[in-house]
Amino acid sequence: NAGAPQHLCGSHLVDALYLVCGPSGFFYNPKGIVEQCCHKPCSIFDLQNYCN
């Protein structure tokens, strides 16, 4: 289930951002997104907040 919140860390997190944001890219704010998506599970909608 792609919409289910999950823990994403390191390269998995970067890969997910590329998939979610596509050609527009994303701004990588390690502190914010690691706190939100690695330490706690996050959803695709959370990832979209980091797209440009």
Curated annotation (Swiss-Prot):
GO terms for biological process: glucose metabolic process. Keywords: Carbohydrate metabolism, Disulfide bond, Glucose metabolism, Hormone, Secreted. Disulfide bonds join 9-38, 21-51, 37-42. One of its GO terms (cellular component) is extracellular space. GO terms for molecular function: hormone activity. It is found in: Secreted. CDD domains: IlGF_insulin_like. Insulin decreases blood glucose concentration. It increases cell permeability to monosaccharides, amino acids and fatty acids. It accelerates glycolysis, the pentose phosphate cycle, and glycogen synthesis in liver. Belongs to the insulin family. Heterodimer of a B chain and an A chain linked by two disulfide bonds. This is Insulin. It comes from Piaractus mesopotamicus. The gene is ins.
